[in-house]
Amino acid sequence: MPNEAALPGEETEVVVVGAGQAGIAMSEHLGNLGIRHIVLERDRIAERWRTQRWDSLVANGPAWHDRFPNLEFPDVGPDAFATKEQVAEYFERYAEKIDAPVRCGVEVSKVRKHEGRPGFRVETSEGTIDAGFVVAATGPFQRPVIPPIVPEGAVRTQLHSSEYRNPEQLPEGAVLVVGAGSSGVQIADELRRSGRRVFLSVGPHDRPPRQYRGRDFCWWLGVLGLWDLTTPPQGAAHVTIAVSGARGGHSVDFRELAGTGIELLGMTDAYEVGDAGTGGVLRFAPDLAENIALGDEKYLELLRAADAYIERNGLDLPEEPEAHVLGPDPECMTDPRLALDLAEAGVTSIVWATGFAADYSWLDVDAYDENGRPDQRRGVSTEPDVYFLGLPWLSRRGSSFIWGVWHDAKYVADHITTRRGYLAYGSN
């Protein structure tokens, strides 16, 4: 797509910042409504899928589900899981299909309100743009978060999951993976399969079945209405989801992971410096069994809801009683390790699969709550004519998924259309 330079003094109706799934979806709906806009992307379309994911990553949802409504994944079966390269190519192809006005290689440094008149001044690496509306479509994965627990130099390598690529990248030795969501579980499993000794620190999580009675969990959440929940269940706002599309897709079972040789630990709690300033001892909370039990209960709850739905609707789906049977607790659960001497265990690397934080330092407007988070309802912020898109639970549980952000973008585009009408009244 051409990298058209932004000219000083250029004007447009809407500036969309970010050309990932949120920015591309936003562009489609604005284009359908005939609203002039520009999508600014500091790197390439879907850059994070290209360069901030490990080599073997695939989508966590099947191709029939994790896509925009108007384009299927080419060369990917409906029940298969697209590779990260195929996902990036999909977004690029979609941008071409809708003729999205994306400008790659343009970084937004600051957005400020005009003084004494409506609209915003958008400062970029290629000049300034005046716009009536701004959509922040950069999503929640801006700044990798590594808890300040283990000091630099305690082990040979510490890196965030966004920097991890493959087992060969890490020095020889055992690996501690902190975080048991989709990223942490898949990375730990890959490292174990490569022959590494692996420790996995497990916190609160939700582990839905990959498939149950012949249907993917994405289908079950749809027919049970769970994608449409508008607020997370109590205490679940920051609970990670452990699900995997790797190796054709499978349910995450922490007991099975322990059976393969991965040692499970509770949440990483504190670090004590070793005698020589290296190695040291990591301490873990005594919450491993509790965390796994809570994940098990959510898993079984979904199975029970699916069974009830099948019976209520007279569906002819295969029985799967074995899915309800949990295996025996491994020793690492019944007698959990609460301290790990890193040098003694041969740990040379720590992979922090501990999530991300948003970064809106470039968006200098009054659109944040007392905790610095976007203050918005369904993407409409408290700062008139500023919108957020691509955030988890923006309007519903499905908001952070490809198909979910598409529907959120339509709502935002319709809201912009309504605002345009009010602002244009009496201007002629």
Stretches with model-predicted labels:
Residues 46-70, 257:
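Redox-cofactor-proximal catalytic regions of oxidoreductases
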Residues 2-51, 79-428:
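Flavin (primarily FAD) cofactor-binding/catalytic cores of flavoenzymes
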Residues 74-78:
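A short acidic, helix-capping loop that chelates divalent metal ions and anchors anionic groups
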Residues 68-72, 390-392:
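A short small-residue
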